[in-house]
Amino acid sequence: MKTELIKLHLTLLCVLISFLSFSQVKLPTKPKTSTFEVINSNLGLPKVNIPNSNLLNNQPNGMNVYEQDRRRVAQQKNELKKIYAELNTDRINYSLPSYGNIESTKHYRKAFEQLAEMKTDSFSIKKATFIIENAYFEEKQNYAEFEKVVKQTGNFLREKMEELGYDQNRNLAKNFMLFQFFSDTLQIKSKNLKHLPFKYDFEDYLGIKDWSQMFVSKLLATGKGQCNSLPRLYLILAEEIGAEAFLSLSPNHSYIKFKDEEENWYNVELTNGMFTTESMILQSGFIKSEALQSGIYMQQMTEKQLLSQLYSDFAQGYARKFGYDPFVKKVIDKALELYPNSITANMMNSNYLTIQFEYVAKQVGINPRDRKDLQNIRNFPNIVKLLNNVNSQYNKVDDLGFEFMSAEAYQNWLASLKQTKQKQDSDEMKKQFNIKLKKTFKN
């Protein structure tokens, strides 16, 4: 390598010597300062405008950029949801699934047809009650046996009235006899027949575990009942002996009203075997003025309204046995057709519409119980209509004067009916009835 560098050096030296020897070239002179041209430092470069401080302050900061991105993403999500809504609108099922494929539901459909054949202003509550309960038991009950028990009881009541010397043409006499049948021990000495009073059944009195706890057939079999079965049997027996009596409602409760020949009205509380004053019923604290104005509480029901109540009970039995489906809605609509202000039917309609709305909302991925998520239904006009229907129905229930009464409050109110003052008032009424009936017998 060193040898090659020496050779290269010698070659360059020889070339330089030959150049100097054979060419007359002037040696370069020292340049003067004045000969240099001033060069523009920006020559060939783009001109850049430097912004002032005010412009810099107006530029978006990191938080503003984040907010803009967040809004843009949210808008994109909403647009996607709208597209999704348009694509899936035709796939939404707006009706609750039917339980009609269950074999035992046929008994309810048959029972509905039987109830629909009844005249609204004149029907047999005995027959209607059997139809309703028999549907729940899948038509395994025997109407002839049920009718036999009712007739035998009717005969017992008539014989007892005759033994006591009551005028069986008087409505007061017949209702007082019915009251004693439910609340006292009765005997017919000539035939050695004895009847014990019915008792209030505190076990599952709302029928939550077993809906048949609410039935008249259960009351007749066990001698125990509650505020649904006791008044129902009273009306059945009143029908049997030709007494005029009416069903009336108060919060979570039903009782009997009847009037005597002087147009005086009386309240029969069968859960404790007493006559009850209007003031005692009002003392529950859950009867608002709106409820009295709308007539949902403390008013005697007409035949048409009573049939509506039976339809509501019928729908409740189906819903407890199977669940809410379009058949329940069909029955509720019939009940509301007969009695638009029925608080029982309106409450059931509220339940149905709520369940229907939640079912539809979940189909499009919306949690109906999440307020934030619920806002997304605006992309589904038909679902918005369902929600509006729910709210309208809730408003109607409120306008009728409904106020929720807890099970504890209800039990406390029932207990208050047994207080000394209430018992004294009831005993005084019984004395007055006996006096009136004895005077009639003497005449």
Predicted regions and their residues:
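Bacterial Sec-dependent N-terminal signal peptides
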Residues: 1-31
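A structural boundary/capping signal
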Residues: 24-443
